[in-house]
From Swiss-Prot:
GO BP annotations listed: auxin polar transport; auxin-activated signaling pathway; cotyledon development; phyllome development; positive gravitropism; response to auxin; root hair elongation; root hair initiation
Designated name of the protein: Protein kinase PINOID
Sequence similarity: Belongs to the protein kinase superfamily. Ser/Thr protein kinase family.
Catalytic activity: L-seryl-[protein] + ATP = O-phospho-L-seryl-[protein] + ADP + H(+); L-threonyl-[protein] + ATP = O-phospho-L-threonyl-[protein] + ADP + H(+)
């Protein structure tokens, strides 16, 4: 069953068709070169140094070329590799890199601004670009470059050769991951969500199709056009049992540039001055009334038409873990309206075809906490990843060293040859750092 998503939802929503990997890019190339390419002003397009990309050859190449100002003509499109609700993604490489064995491959997302303006979705493309500029994390994309070409807006990011977790799951026995594999991928997604929430970003579109697999087997979340970027900052919660200390402090408003500094400063104060308090990287005051997401993954508060906040990501995380382990989502049904009704009214249940091991019982307990229909009681809604990480399902897993673990599967590094009319390729070969705190 195809999952309908990637947009502000209605029961008639459908995904844009994805063409075969060998589709020619020549028509787009012609359109782009009919008008002189415009570039983003230097102060806006300058790529600030990203510490997590310090050993990334592809990132270094982009930064070297960036000094002269990048345009569409600096890239060679190879083939179309995906399409979504707001854009089309092409595999590409830097023009002039004739030795393919030494070339870095990239993914270029191309947005037709005129088409989006007609559909009144241009704000989604702008939101994604804004968020990408904020990110510097091993499990999240880095914005390598951005530029305009005629009425197209282009962003260049890392190319993930391993596809996505949805496709990878379908290649597993019985189309589901082992518990240990599911735990590995869930842990990396959890760390990525923690970082996003620390920045005040509610993802709102977590699903296996949006979790890409890098060439080293580790994951990368993608597609941020449905995300909510709030001014809410992380809260401080007391570990004391007194009612007044268990209240979350109401965060003040800060500019986006000052937000991260305030979090770091506050976390240091928590550690040094108030040892009984816990730093919570969770935008607990962020709210939205938008009806967005993927039907099988939306939380009950969204399905019922109410407002929502950070808790929707923890619901989606529970649905994701359920699907990874059992091969289907917990409230799946033949039609979208029945799916939404199930999400609101039907009780969570688990397969009973075989006895559950203790490891699986831990997984079920975690999923049950995440899929609490009351967002105020949902696991993660108040203290975020901090309370999810300590669940017995993740016992023995060192989150700070997760990138040193060998992933369940490491994809082939082979990139298919482009067609004659194609252009571009790029892929990073960065080695992971020893550890990460976010």
């Amino acid at each position: 069953m195809l999952r309908e998503s990637d947009g502000e939802m209605s029961l008639g929503t459908t995904n844009s068709p994805i063409s075969s990997g060998t589709e020619s890019c020549s028509s787009f190339s012609r359109l782009s070169f009919d008008a002189p390419p415009s570039t983003i002003p230097e102060e806006e397009s300058f790529l600030s140094l990203k510490p997590h990309r310090s050993s990334d050859f592809a990132y270094a190449e982009i930064r070297r070329r960036k000094k002269q100002g990048l345009t569409f003509r600096d890239f060679r499109l190879m083939r179309r590799i995906g399409a979504g609700d707001i854009g089309t993604v092409y595999l590409c490489r830097l023009a002039g890199d004739e030795e393919e064995s030494r070339s870095s491959y990239f993914a270029m997302k191309v947005v037709d601004k005129e088409a989006l303006a007609l559909k009144k979705k241009m704000h989604r493309a702008e939101m994604e670009k804004t968020i990408l500029k904020m990110l510097d994390h091993p499990f999240l994309p880095t914005l390598y470059a951005e530029f305009e070409a005629s009425h197209f807006s282009c962003i260049v990011m890392e190319y993930c050769s391993g596809g996505d977790l949805h496709s990878l799951r379908h290649r597993q026995p019985h189309r589901r991951f082992s518990l240990s594999s599911a735990r590995f991928y869930a842990a990396e997604v959890l760390v990525a969500l923690e970082y996003l929430h620390m920045l005040g970003i509610i993802y709102r579109d977590l699903k296996p199709e949006n979790i890409l697999v890098r060439s080293d087997g580790h994951i990368m979340l993608s597609d941020f056009d449905l995300s909510l970027c709030s001014d809410s900052i992380a809260a401080v919660e007391s570990s004391s049992s007194s009612p007044e200390n268990q209240q979350l402090r109401s965060p003040r408003r800060f500019t986006r540039l000052a937000r991260l500094f305030q979090r770091v400063l506050r976390s240091k104060k928590v550690q040094t001055l108030e040892p009984t308090r816990l730093f919570v990287a969770e935008p607990v005051t962020a709210r939205s009334g938008s009806f967005v997401g993927t039907h099988e993954y939306v939380a009950p508060e969204v399905a019922s038409g109410g407002s929502h906040g950070n808790a929707v990501d923890w619901w989606a995380f529970g649905v994701f873990l359920y699907e990874m382990i059992y091969g289907k989502t917990p409230f799946v049904a033949p039609t979208n309206d029945v799916i939404l009704r199930n999400i609101v009214k039907r009780q969570l249940s688990f397969p009973t075809d075989s006895p559950a091991t203790m490891f699986e019982l831990h997984a079920r307990n975690l999923i049950s906490g995440l899929l609490n229909k009351d967002p105020t009681k949902r696991l993660g809604s108040r203290r975020g990843a901090a309370e999810v990480k300590v669940h017995p399902f993740f016992k023995g897993l060192n989150f700070a060293l997760i990138r040193t673990l060998t992933p369940p599967e490491i994809p082939s590094s082979v990139v298919k040859k482009p067609m004659k009319s194609a252009t571009f390729s790029g892929r990073s070969s960065n080695k992971p750092a020893a550890f990460d705190y976010f």
